[in-house]
């Protein structure tokens, strides 16, 4: 894909995923350029792909952005696939050609965390994997009335103009008084504090060493990912905190989006081995104490047992986490416990998921 293709790709995206829109959002092409062309890692070899039909019209496309990973000590630039779209019969044929280009035998590393069932089948047919745990999101409720109101406001914009927040607060006081399990409790002696983004990265780099496959998050790339993620203002403010045990030793840190009194979206959780239960309990206690109605995040195998200890928590499936690679050691790590991806190292922060 070239920059000159962006207006046509924006129109194709709108016709494919936003069929109720009468016209393409005027900001969409610019956003596509920011996300898919401005990364410090961008090269055409790891960029997006388009297919032209016999009239030289774009009838199918795969949007992709690069994220650098460490795979058993060696750097590998992954393609994060963010949207797969096609239109008409020629588009279906073009999509099949694009999909063949991304078969496992040809790729160092490609993945998505938001594939549809049909797309997931294509990934598997192309030699790829579906990771079942990472295909789930956990959702924890702290204030049920406020959580229901927040969800309703996202679906019915008119509700955002009505003064219903006060009623939700009154209802939640009563509910939390009668059902104390809605409150999240930390472990004794564990504390947390806000930290800067550079501090988060300094701590996370050490904690990611437990995984044989994990993002590099070099300073140029991390700064770019943060700047791109912050464009999604609907998620709230991007914040991070560090967690320490009773002796004051840092055992974990996390990055999240939060909007006052609404939903918190946990992007990334990092921790030392065997500290998962303490870290996860503190995260939920923090978000509860900060007044959020609810919280959500991508399920991760290394955190699953700790997350499942929470009350008023459910797992939801919104899209499949799929990957393809020609490297056997990467595939082995993904199947086992040596793989870390998601959050900033995914498309979960993208405005394309719910905006435009």
PLM regions: where:
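Glycine-rich acyl-CoA binding loop
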Residues: 89-102, 276-280, 284
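A short, internal acetyl-CoA/4′-phosphopantetheine-binding micro-motif in the GNAT/acyltransferase core
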Residues: 82-92, 268-276
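Amide-forming acyltransferase catalytic core, primarily the GNAT-like/NAT-type
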Residues: 7-71, 76, 129-261
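Acidic/polar helix N-cap motif
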Residues: 2-5
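Residues that line or immediately flank small-molecule/substrate-binding pockets and catalytic motifs
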Residues: 65-66, 83, 88, 114, ...
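Active-site/acyl-donor-binding loops of N-acyltransferases
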Residues: 109-176, 228-230, 238-239, 252-253, ...
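Short, surface-exposed connector motifs at secondary-structure boundaries
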Residues: 100-106, 289
